[in-house]
Amino acid sequence: MALIEGVGDEVTVLFAVLACLLVLALAWVSTHTTESTDPQPQPPGTTTPAQPSEAMSASDSIREEAPGAESPSLRHRGPSAQPEPDTGVTASTPPDSPQEPLLLRLKFLNDSEQVARAWPQDTIGSLKRTQFPGQEQQVRLIYQGQLLGDDTQTLGSLHLPPNCVLHCHVSTRVGPPHPPCPPGSEPGPSGLEIGSLLLPLLLLLLLLLWYCQIQYRPFFPLTATLGLAGFTLLLSLLAFAMYRP
């Protein structure tokens, strides 16, 4: 007995396989679509300097004096004050006292310790690069229960005492850093989310196959039943991995 009246089983199976391939192709294409981003706004032009609000009005009020006249202020003007000679003694500021290096004890999760020597002006990022070259993004420093996440913060601003303990946590994996979103720009609208519909479609197809296997058991040999069971197990693991918190 054919699955569909008037249509051979080979044609039905062929169309089912083509439908599955089409769904997989659409899901693969949807994962490679790039999100369009809005262009960054151009920086506003520089404002022109403001023109002076008041003109020099004092020059208009000066009166011209006669050529032979002599100002009374010139008669009574005394000799100009002579500048005092420079004694040559300048107050010299005492030089800054040299800062002492900090001895830090880096303690790991396995209770092993490593002594690091740094300066107060060194930053958290430079300390990571010095002690853990190539693993800066995987190292987390913790001091008194507080995560030191700002790599630009200096050690002197933390007021670390001598021979203090910094707990180090080195993660095994780290994702690529996400660039910060520029101001004034918003993420563009996402494309067609076909990838999120793939799992429900596969579940619907799986339920249809199990229904056909139960209703038309003679058309499903042992190998087809085992393949259907394996596909069900694989799809269950995929769903668990996707929706696991």
Swiss-Prot record:
Expressed in adult brain; at protein level. Isoform 1 (lHOPS) is highly expressed in small intestine, stomach and epididymis. Isoform 2 (sHOPS) and iHOPS are abundantly expressed in brain, liver and adrenal gland. Its main location: membrane. Pfam families: ubiquitin. InterPro entries: TMUB1/2, Ubiquitin-like_dom, Ubiquitin-like_domsf. Keywords: Cell membrane, Cytoplasm, Cytoskeleton, Endosome, Membrane, Nucleus, Phosphoprotein, Postsynaptic cell membrane, Synapse, Transmembrane, Transmembrane helix. Residues 102-175 form the Ubiquitin-like domain. This is Transmembrane and ubiquitin-like domain-containing protein 1. The chain crosses the membrane at residues 11-31, 194-214, 219-239. PANTHER family: PROTEIN C7ORF21, TRANSMEMBRANE AND UBIQUITIN-LIKE DOMAIN-CONTAINING PROTEIN 1. It comes from Mus musculus. It is found in: Membrane; Postsynaptic cell membrane; Recycling endosome; Cytoplasm. Disruption phenotype: Strong increase in home cage locomotor activity during the dark phase (subjective day) of the light:dark (L:D) cycle. There were no changes in activity during the light period and in locomotor activity observed in other assays, e.g. novel open-field. Isoform 2 seems to undergo a selective cleavage in the C-terminal region to release an additional cytoplasmic form. Disulfide bonds: none annotated. One of its GO terms (cellular component) is centrosome. It is a multi-pass membrane protein. The keyword Nucleus applies.
